[in-house]
Amino acid sequence: MRAESWTWQHPDRSSPAVEDLSLDIRPGERVLITGASGSGKSTLLHGLAGVLPAEGASISGRLLIDGAEPSQRRGRAGLMQQDPEAAVVLSRVGDDVAFAPENLAVPRKEIPDRVREALQAVGLERLPLEHPTAQLSGGQKQRLALTGILAMRPGLLLLDEPTANLDPDGALQVRDAVLSAAEATGATLLVVEHRTHRWAAAMDRIVRLDAGQSGSWAGHDSSGQYSADENSPGQHSPDHFLAALPDWSPPSPAGETLLRAEELAVHRHPPTTTWRSHQPPAPVLSRVSLSVRGGEAVAVTGPNGVGKSTLLLTLAGLIPRHGGRLDPDPETMTPRELIGHSGVVFQEPEHQFLRATVAEELDHRQDLLERLRLSHVAQANPFTLSGGEKRRLSVGTALASGAQILLLDEPTTGQDAAAFADLVTLLRDHLDTGGAVIAVTHDQDLLTALQARRLEVTSCSPTASSQEQPSAEAPETASSPELPGFGAVRSTSWLGRRGPLGKLIALVLITLALVASIDLVSAAVVVMGCFALLPLAGIRPLALMRRIWPFAVGALLAVWGTAIAGEESGRVLVDFGFTTVSTGSVMLGLALGLRGFAMVLPSVIILSTTDPTDLADSLAQQLKLPARFVLGALAAMRLMGMLAQQWTTLGHARRARGLGKGRGFGSRLASTLSQIFGLLVQAIRTATRLAVTMESRGFDGGPRSWARPAQFTAADLLVVLGGAALAAAATAAAMAAGTWSLVW
């Protein structure tokens, strides 16, 4: 890899992200890239992966991989981005890991071994290959993102803060997995990391980027000690963060109790039944008790995936609790009352940005701009900041609200030593004034700096306590919002186990029978047949109706519209003067409405029992549709599921920022439109990042392999015959009743 006076400037910025960088990295070399937050580290990795946008950007110099432009070497480099959510492409763990080897046309028989080895390397071997990726925590998604890259076995590993959201044991395991993979394959390794003490001893050299200027590097001597200045921005030793902080003690005695939780039971989603399940979701944490007083800091710690973030949002009153008490109860507060009670920092900072500039997000608080080191980007759009800058801004928005309690999710992620010190000083000031801090964190330095009381969460069901307990990782089983057609979890019903091709053929046959004639009898036969077959699909009738009620309403509207607007025939039932309702128009309306409903019903049943990835495999392998189109559509479907989650999160963020819906219609409409605009922004940004992930994993129009063969079995033939039988029965019944009439 070589950089020759390379400069890259974002179109919305006045100064380059990386300026005049010259650097040579030899094949197989291990390089640690450090530097202050916002110094261009992520930009360099994206440039090497060939995924930086060229439109509107100012670029000079050259960046080369194996003597060619990075865009010509896609698949050669594996990029792990900062955002773990956008680094997951497909809806199931095994499919997501296999995505990159498939794109690289790895032989089918080799892919399962690559998937298993990669999952074991990062500590996710306990997860079933069928496990939905939407049910993973942020830290687990970060491990999964790395797993997909390791399965590629690329020649160049580009990792952007790969251990930022991981618990200490997980961080060490991921580091060892990366180093082992680089050793086994001879890959060149570039790691961006602020916590350099985890990596330094195993790296060949450190490259430091300072404020977009030329990179400088420091090698190590025979004793393994680095000659780089440890006090430089971005450089870390195990005790470096704390050494720069002045002595401090929390207020004593502590103030009044600001929040008391008793026997809390929490889950990401409300305690209600779903369309598939008779029972509400089981709490991921239960019997959690906690009391927080003014001047106190509490650190919620524990392995990835046990429900720490869910607990934090429940304490903030943004997620309904499944049991227990909160005093005061934030769920009963109005948005304006809530903003004075608690300020929230979400795991993904972008979700809480509501203003056009950084200065507006901080209410033009010059003191916060300076103390958070954001003065130079005061007029920038918050979404264009670096990862570390976004994190500091999110903490700043919580501080600017003046809330008594700060509830922070990983507040120090992506921070260099100087930025860490600034954040700690601000949080100490908040404690000194009688406020409280509750932080979900894996950062032991933050616990020490705030002298925080530890709330160790170690499993999905036992009581969380303030005492340290042995850790036992368990995935948080929070289900995600599902799309109207597809679910993230593969159906285990008889129909769910059948192949997509057979179900699609059956659906086409039924639809053709309905399209051929507009009559009540054939439509009624199809509707009754579908409801009779619901046990084979594992769907309860009432649950199905709750899911398709909009289509039922549409059918009724079609009946009414046709009845009053259709041609008069037969006996006149009602005469409105300007129009009439006759027996003929009513019968035509009933036929059209029931026909439309009958077309929708089997489609919903088929799609509800069809796994999206299985469908994509079938379309590409059996129907020979272009793989690029099929997989792009599959990724878009996952994006839709992500947007459903983000809609809920944006609602939480708006409430946390005091912008909940008012009582009047106009206020509610304005709030909804504003949230829709926020979702549109998130959709564009998430889609862009997802496209970057797919490109960096070798996704293009070239030949590829498939980890799972799409097969057509005897049971699939039964599905086709069943569809044909239902279509024939509907047509025969209509003909026997004399209502069948060919519409062509």
Model-derived segments and spans:
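The feature captures the beta-strand-to-loop junction immediately N-terminal to the Walker
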Residues: 34-36, 301-303
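Helix-to-loop junction immediately C-terminal to a conserved catalytic motif
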Residues: 49, 316
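Conserved ABC ATPase "signature" region
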Residues: 110-127, 365-377
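Conserved ABC ATPase signature
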Residues: 132-136, 140, 381-385, 389
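Hydrophobic anchor residue at the start of the ABC signature
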Residues: 146-147, 395
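ABC ATPase C-loop
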Residues: 149-150, 398-399
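Catalytic Walker B motif of ABC-type/P-loop ATPase nucleotide-binding domains
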Residues: 157-161, 406-410
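Transmembrane alpha-helix interface motif
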Residues: 475-522, 526-535, 645-744
